[in-house]
Amino acid sequence: MRFGRKPAALLLLLSMLLAGCTSGSVDRLYCLPKRSEAHRDLQLAIDAAMGGMEYSAPRSGENLQAVQVRDLDGDGKGEYLLFAKKAGDRPLQILIFRPTADGYALSETIETYGTAFDRVEYANIDGKPGYELIVGRRLSDQVIRAVSVYSFAEGQSALLTTDNYTHFTTCDLDGDGNGELLVFKHGEAAEQTGVAVYYSYRDGIMERSAEVSMSAPTENVKRILVGWLADNRMAVFVASTVEENAIVTDVFSVVDGKFTNLTLSGEAGNGVGMVRNYYVYADDIDNDGVTELPELISMRPLSESESPGDSQYLIRWYALRSDGTREQKLYTYHNYESGWYISIQSDWAQRLTIVQDGTSYGVYLWNADNTESEKLLTVYAFSGQDRETQAVSGNRFLLYEGDTVQYAAELEVAAVRYGVTKDRLIRNFHLIQQDWKTGET
């Protein structure tokens, strides 16, 4: 990938690659669309080269097609890459087709070891025109995997580096505009935490950093996010489970030319527990382009009779700087069960109590000396057949209208004294977005 916006035309071409296929064998599901003479020529070239092979699409990542297109050599024309498998010592095949005056021709086949293609990415790593190909392969039916980086700057493929991995991603941690490879892998012993290794292109070779420790084994990794620090540096946020009920987030970046884990070197206490059995991940919660990390704050119960299991939490979001210090950002109340959250003003954070009653949530604010509380509002989630009527019954007003759920609220008299209005509440109400890669919130 290039670390900016992808050209719209390229995205459109990628989306068309598998369109228009008719029903039939599994292999036919990967056929190219019969939309033009050029595509017919390409299909003929593929059919001629596929003897004894079967399509073998990558198993994970964003690039899941068996046939993909990228401008590998930077000549302005896209090469077609076909991922296939055959019998033999090097069963995994990457067939590369280039346009010619007469149509398309197979220009190169990369043969390699493995049982399946795991993941494929593209990035401009060497700074030359075109994209490098980053291919992850499964080497066995177990967890052993290898990632290789190929350059096509000279026309044909050149292997830049290979390493084993559990997870990998591409990024631009040093801010030079070129991509780098970040690999996460096992430590020396099975019981150890994982390690991260950073590869960058320097003086014609891929330089390998020293191994940097993670906070958990690589098997515990739940989510990897490429984002930004508060001082405008790119970072990679790696969320892993610890002790079965919490998430710890490692934050990797390049500081003063050195690859480092900011979590282990700064003041960041990066562990966060679960909220009602949902993990809370780093996110750009305020849409300012900076990635925020969460920290749970237990709210005071409305009465001493409430059990610990009834406890509600606020989330305090903060951004990291490259020196490991924090920049406090905002507070939210996240209701993962109902799929919504509201932003909370910071001076209320230590005085707020939220009480659940079925699918309604009462919001209470304590006075300055914490001796009395007043109810400010109630948030509702209606999902029955009469949800539209319930959402606007009495003094309720609509916060958000979903396909199957109506979110509504009702303000109490005390809300006026604290500046809570209908418009303000609607602005501060948000739906929790689902991560399309993992299906998690």
Language model: regions and residue ranges:
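A short acidic/glycine-rich loop-to-helix N-cap element
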Residues: 413-424
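A short acidic-to-branched-hydrophobic micro-motif
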Residues: 369-386
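Sec-dependent bacterial lipoprotein signal peptides
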Residues: 1-19
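Beta-propeller-forming repeat regions
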Residues: 21-356, 362-365, 386-402, 406-408, ...
